[in-house]
Swiss-Prot record:
Ca(2+). Can also use Mg(2+), but with lower efficiency. Optimum temperature is 45 degrees Celsius. Activity remains at about 60 percent and 14 percent at 60 degrees Celsius and 65 degrees Celsius respectively. This is Mannosyl-oligosaccharide alpha-1,2-mannosidase 1B. One of its GO terms (molecular function) is calcium ion binding.
Length: 510
């Protein structure tokens, strides 16, 4: 799960007309002709450098570039989110110049200073995850990229500095943290509950920090919060075995509801259950067991096939006896999660179900005019908009929000499908998505979001470039065509790295 870096509703974001953001057609034509894995990997590198150069020219050291106006954004506290989020991708691409630029920047960050509210979740997955990943990669398989190892050590030092700034968030009666905090006053937003994903997507990064530093406090804080999610109460919080509610009371750790989904707000809790098992199957066997229960219950209770396209599979939501037939781009990580769990646990049923989910999410790309999927969609026959009946009859779904803000989840699951099956079709799906993003989102200085993926030219443009373009979209596309390496996802139990929800790979403990 990633919140948009802009807090306004998508309909109210800064828009420009398509004419102001036409793609660079010469590049588009060159990309479309790339056939070999090497040429495709190089095309992704070019896109990364294009976006990086625009960010450095117009927005550094701010958090985001506004890639149409060439303005800046500071949605992530002004610490240079795009730079930190780009580090692990630059390392994997072997770009020594950019890696060292980012290391020099990270050494200058003062994480104790910001004028804005801090999100514990977003700061953990982007900044802490990005620095820990850079450390693991540069101390290991990419150590040749940095001559001065003191720069690499700074990544771990700054990770600990950041965690020390954030850790007061866990100082609550239950240990369930506040998410929205003021690091200057040690205050919070007064929330009485925290979300499932926001609470349950800290444990990988904070545990890795403890394992690297030898200071167990960070792991203990995140794992204490996670324990409430692994052992939910009351019973109504777990309507199906392994599937739990969406909100947890900060005062006592009890769940406040039994609303179940894999959508944004819940998603990465389930993602991290199996990833913690991959990180260390001995220490986190319970996490793996809980993921299996959630996966089995999802297949049994949440799998949903659109009336007009029974060949497609999506995951519905559930609340108090009612099913919600709607989903999101965010949810499309689910295929990759089932594929990872299936290969690690040697469960062919999970692999097959994961591929079914991947096929469904691919169709949300395949059926739009741009070949890019929407922010949200539904398949409830009672709720089909009158102007989308043709789409619903043909595709089996209708679009609830046609925005695309450079999200990675569909490409992410295509990547997992490629790595775990070896079937070329999934690489082609990745490539097609990348070509279309280049065609419709590329600007003179970076990449912009789209207002309507099912309109000519993608509708208007959002004048914002999320940091996860660097961290996730371009990384997963590049990895799909890059040579094998120990940071690549592996079949079976051979993974040397595991990816956090921002696509930052950290070395497994086992």
């Amino acid at each position: 799960m990633h919140f948009s870096s802009l807090s306004l509703p998508l309909t109210a974001l800064s828009l420009v007309t398509p004419s102001l953001a036409y793609p660079q057609f010469k590049f588009e034509q060159r990309v479309a002709r790339s056939n070999s894995s090497e040429s495709r990997a190089n095309a992704v590198k070019e896109a990364f450098v294009h976006a990086w150069d625009g960010y450095m020219q117009y927005a550094y050291p701010h958090d985001e570039l506004h890639p149409i106006s060439n303005g800046v954004g500071d949605s992530r506290n002004g610490w240079g989110a795009s730079a930190v989020d780009a580090l692990s991708t630059a390392v994997i691409m072997g770009n020594e110049t950019i890696v060292n630029q980012i290391l020099d920047h990270i050494a200058t960050i003062d994480y104790s200073k910001t004028d804005d509210q801090v999100s514990l979740f977003e700061t953990t997955i982007r900044y802490l995850g990005g620095m820990l990943s850079g450390y693991d990669l540069l101390k290991g398989p990419a150590s040749n990229l940095v001559k001065d190892q003191a720069k690499v050590k700074t990544l771990l030092d700054q990770s600990q500095n950041l965690a020390d700034v954030l850790k007061f968030a866990f100082d609550t009666p239950s240990g369930i943290p506040y998410n929205n905090i003021n690091i200057t006053s040690h205050g919070n937003d007064g929330a009485t509950t925290n979300g499932l994903a926001v609470t349950g997507t800290l444990v990988l990064e904070w545990t890795r920090l403890s394992d690297l530093t030898g200071d167990t406090e960070y792991a203990q804080l995140s794992q204490k919060a996670e324990d409430y999610l692994l052992n939910p109460s009351p019973k109504s919080a777990e309507p199906f075995e392994g599937l739990v509610g969406s909100h947890i009371n900060i005062s006592n750790g009890a769940f406040a509801d039994g609303q179940v989904s894999w959508n944004g707000g819940d998603d990465s809790f389930y993602e991290y259950l199996i990833k913690m098992y991959v990180y260390d199957p001995k220490r986190f066997s319970t996490y793996g067991d809980r993921w299996v229960k959630a996966a089995e219950s999802s297949i049994k209770h949440l799998a949903s096939h659109p009336e007009k396209r029974p060949d497609l599979t999506f995951l519905a939501s559930y609340n108090d006896g009612q099913y919600g037939l709607s989903s999101q781009h965010l949810t499309c990580f689910d295929g990759g999660s089932f594929l990872l769990g299936g290969t690690v646990l040697d469960r062919d049923d999970f692999i097959q179900f994961g591929l079914d989910l991947v096929k469904g999410c691919h169709e949300t790309y395949n059926q739009t005019l741009t070949g890019i999927g929407p922010e949200s969609f539904g398949w409830d026959p009672k709720n089909v908009p009158s102007d989308q009946k043709e789409l619903y009859e043909r595709a089996g779904f209708y679009i609830s929000s046609g925005a695309y803000i450079l999200r990675p989840e569909v490409i992410e699951s295509f990547y997992y499908a490629w790595r775990i099956t070896g079937q070329e079709i999934y690489r082609e799906w990745v490539w097609n998505a990348f070509v279309n993003i280049n065609k419709y989102c590329r600007t003179d200085s970076g990449f912009a979001g789209l207002t309507n993926v099912n309109a000519a030219n993608g509708g208007g443009r959002y004048d914002n470039q999320e940091s996860f373009l660097f961290a996730e979209v371009l990384k997963y596309v590049y990895l799909t065509f890059a040579p094998d390496n120990e940071w690549q996802v592996q079949r079976g139990k051979g993974n040397k790295f595991v990816y956090n929800t921002e696509a930052h790979p950290v070395r497994v403990a086992a």
